Each structure stands twice: as C-alpha cells, then as structure tokens.
C-alpha cells in the first residue's frame, strides 16, 4: 500500500524527533530501518539463497520456529533477561544494510537481522518476529510489551 508507506516513512522520523517510544514489529522493523536510511532485502530466498520456509511459518503463529540470538548488553538482553529467544517468523523481506543510527542487536541462526535499536535512545527498538503471538505463553515476548508500555507511560508523564 503506497499511501501507508508514505505515511509511515513520514511519521517515524517525527516520532523519533519528539523522543516518543517506537516499537516496530515485523514490517515495523523494516519501515523503521528504511525511514532512518537503511535498505532491505526484498526477497530472502532469491537474494540470499536462504529458504524462506524458515521465515514463513504456517499457523499456529504462536509456535516458535527458530532462535534469535541477542547481543550481550543489548537493550533486548536488558529487557528480556536472556541472550537467546525462541521466536516465530513470518516474513520474506528483511534488513539488508542497517541505518547508521541503528544498532543490530539480534540475528536468526541464518544471519538474518531480527532485532535492532536506536544508538542514541533506548526508546526506539524493533523486532522482525511477532511477539504478539507469543506473549500469552512466553514471558520474554511479554517483557517486550511491558517495556514498551513503561516507556509510553514515562513519555506521557514527561508531557504533563
């Protein structure tokens, strides 16, 4: 949807400039990266030679299909308390070149980027997987949402 692309590519830099919390999920990590100047792999299988079956699971989406490894000391390790997380996966695109203002914080076993955060603020982070399908039975996925809610409340309180 070209209009959605335009809207999201405009609103993300505005939110970051206002120091608003941003939590990108799936397409959100991709749009965040492009909005900040990075590039995408348009099709993992044809461009990287990695079978997309690892990244395009069938239902149930709450079932983990691969491991994401978080960098030690990353915001994701601080939020979840772990350096490895079992995740779902439903995408055929991914980050190619990360934006210079983003830090790569997590990878799938095949090297696909699965987690990033802003270098200059702890309020901007994103994942390629779908924690919303995992959070009812995975404490680590739920911690991502809990952290985002806390950031949002802090932001709201700062504006009072």
Model-predicted regions and their roles:
Residues 1-20, 45-160:
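Amide-donor transfer/coupling interface in amidating biosynthetic enzymes
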Residues 13-41:
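Catalytic nucleophile loop
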């Amino acid at each position: 949807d070209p209009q959605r692309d335009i809207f999201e590519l405009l609103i993300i830099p505005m939110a970051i400039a206002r120091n608003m919390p941003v939590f990108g999920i799936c397409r959100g990590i991709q749009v965040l990266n492009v909005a900040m100047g990075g590039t995408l792999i348009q099709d993992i299988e044809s461009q990287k030679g990695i079978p997309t079956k690892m990244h395009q699971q069938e239902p149930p989406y709450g079932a983990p299909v691969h491991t994401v490894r978080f960098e030690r000391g990353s915001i994701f390790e601080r939020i979840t308390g772990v350096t490895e997380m079992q995740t779902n996966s439903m995408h055929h695109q991914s980050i190619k070149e990360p934006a210079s203002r983003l830090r790569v914080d997590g990878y799938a076993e095949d090297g696909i980027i699965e987690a990033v955060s802003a270098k200059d603020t702890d309020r901007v982070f994103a994942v390629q997987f779908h924690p919303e399908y995992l959070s009812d039975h995975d404490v680590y996925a739920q911690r991502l949402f809990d952290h985002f809610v806390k950031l949002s409340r802090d932001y709201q309180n700062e504006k009072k």
